[in-house]
Design a protein with these regions (language model features):
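Ribosome-associated RNA-binding proteins
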Residues: 1-196
Length: 196
């Protein structure tokens, strides 16, 4: 018997080479979405045999520039990161892409981010059945839960402490989401003119 060594990126569960091969053969730009405990990262990548080229990048820390006071790792933030990414893509004439998840599973945060990219006007194949509900994305469920919890003042302040510290009333969460979405849609992402 002999030992057949597997590639390091397979052993570390970083790369699915069947999906990777399909991406390289298609020669289309692809979007990767990574979620962590605190942030959501979205990248537009151009595949290349010598190494992938990152064309655009967006993460949930950028939402603070638009006045986002909510959490940076929930469905609302994920949708807004996708919307921001889609606007950046369109400003650089990248109007289509496909999703590449690699070894990570398709979660609701990834689906919300993908829905945000599609809402910006980017052509991306997606199924509406796998997308989260609009009420979950805009935070209506948070506002409803806050109105129920408001009767118990101590529990209300404990559960919504970060929102209250950021001067955001939890009942106004959907309204705040709409404001930030409108700011992202109305902002311009024009490329700076190259000199020379």
């Amino acid at each position: 018997m002999s030992y057949i060594r597997t590639l390091k990126r397979i052993r570390n569960k970083k790369t699915n080479y069947r999906k990777r091969k399909a991406i390289l053969i298609s020669r289309r730009n692809f979007i990767t979405i990574k979620t962590s405990n605190e942030n959501i990262h979205c990248q537009l990548i151009k595949p290349n045999l010598k190494g992938d080229i990152v064309l655009n990048f967006s993460n949930s820390k950028e939402l603070a520039k638009y006045g986002w006071k909510g959490a940076s790792n929930n469905l609302s933030a994920s949708f807004l990161v996708g919307l921001l990414m889609g606007r950046k893509m369109l400003s650089k004439n990248n109007d289509s892409a496909i999703l590449y998840t690699g070894k990570t599973s398709f979660t609701s945060k990834i689906a919300a981010c993908l829905k945000g990219v599609a809402s910006a006007g980017v052509k991306i194949p997606l199924s509406e059945e796998s997308m989260p509900d609009e009420n979950r994305i805009n935070g209506t469920h948070v506002a409803k839960y806050a109105t129920v919890l408001k009767q118990d003042k101590s529990l209300y302040e404990k559960r919504f402490s970060k929102l209250l510290d950021n001067n955001l009333d939890p009942e106004e969460y959907p309204k705040h989401f709409e404001e930030i979405r409108d700011k992202i849609l109305s902002s311009s992402f024009d490329q700076p003119q190259q000199q020379g």
